[in-house]
Amino acid sequence: MDILEILQDDYRKFPNDQTYSLYADDVYFKDPMTEFRGCDRYRQMIGLIKTWFLNPQLDLHNIQQTGSNIRTDWTLSWTTPLPWKPNIQITGWSELTLNEAGLIAAHIDYWHCSRLDVLKQHFGKF
């Protein structure tokens, strides 16, 4: 399988059984909530999603590669473990940059909504 096929499979299985070997040891990650370096930290972040989100799902809408850049368009959804169990949805895209070894050296996520919009989804019923 090539990297696009592996990523498609990872999205389908998310957050379980991710292929961390695709990522450089010092991978740079950034999204509207956090920013860090390191594959171990990336693993921990996915672990937190598995622990704190109910029924997380990452739907891949599009994936394309141009040279050393990969763009994915997606929707992340989950249920937050609050008494009223709000369903949360974020649409966005990721820009991945491959290093010379073909590993993901940077993974930057962008959202089509603000952090406040995500917070409001948690309390929309009140």
Segments from the language model and where they lie:
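C-terminal and inter-domain tail/linker signature
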Residues: M1-F126
